[in-house]
Amino acid sequence: MVLVGRGDGVATGKFGFPSLAGEPAFVLHAGIFRGPAMCRPHLMRSDMTPNPIIERPEQYRFHNGTKAVWPFAVEEYEDRVAGLRDIMEMHGLDAVVLTSMHNVAYYSGFLYCGFGRPYGCVVTATECVTISAGIDAGQPWRRSHGDNITYTDWARDNFWRAVASVTGLGKAVGVEADHLTMERAEKFNTFVKPKRGMDISPATMVQRMTKSAAEIALIKQGAQVADVGGYAIRDAVRVGAREIDVAMAGRDAMEMEIAKRFPDAEYRDTWVWFQSGINTDGAHNPVTSRKLKQGDILSLNCFPMISGY
């Protein structure tokens, strides 16, 4: 960290991250990240020459490694996308932009982790492409049935530019209206410029409600995993045990069982709701460190999350 005087007695911070060339690849100056493409006269190399302006892409494809084993067979995803294309044809849509976790995962197999960043899946008559942030590198492509485009952070709204690169401009496009905020809906109109838009969420919901044989088989295994968690909780219940201890016993047992049954899956979000005594008065009261007492009412819920199911 280098403190740089402004000449008025106030110090500002400048923080440089070294690049492969040995110079700062990014500079934080006055609270703003700037890189070589946004150089200002005061951002100099060590030899006092200006940093060069570097072209930065809006998007790229990072197909790192090989495709992973998806939650379902290729044929399952092909059937789902074919069903969506039937809906598109029925309503005269050229493309559909999916943005919710459940729809992106349902049609592509990729269960994203947003952390404040937009993710999506664009389906056209010929393509099924997930759109992901650079921070996730090659994982979205490996976990997607279909192609993947990575958008960069060099400019605001590169997500929507990546979306538009697949949908094309001036097309009839379906979106999940119940998932788009007013801000994102405005960005969709600005960057995709649809000649006609349609809320596709009711139709996709109906499609997802009809479970395939493969989905039913997975859900049955999930119920069996929940039983494993329930038995572990029963064994952990005793006077003096904390709610958190009991909940962790059930969660750990379920995660181990999921890993045994689904060795190629990604493991996330499995959890237990365990409440005791006064904490049972609300359905969504969080787990606490309250110690169990004789005569307590106990409430437990096991949530084994297997690829979003």
Q: How would you label these PLM feature ranges?
A:
Residues 9, 16, 27-30:
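Short hydrophobic alpha-helical segments enriched in small aliphatic residues
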Residues 2-10:
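Extreme N-terminal basic, low-complexity initiation segments
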Residues 39-229, 287:
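A composition/biophysics-driven feature that prefers long, compositionally simple stretches
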Residues 193, 221-231, 235-242, 251-259:
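Generic secondary-structure signature for well-ordered alpha-helical cores
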Residues 104-114, 191, 200-206, 210, ...:
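Short catalytic-site patches enriched in acidic/histidine residues
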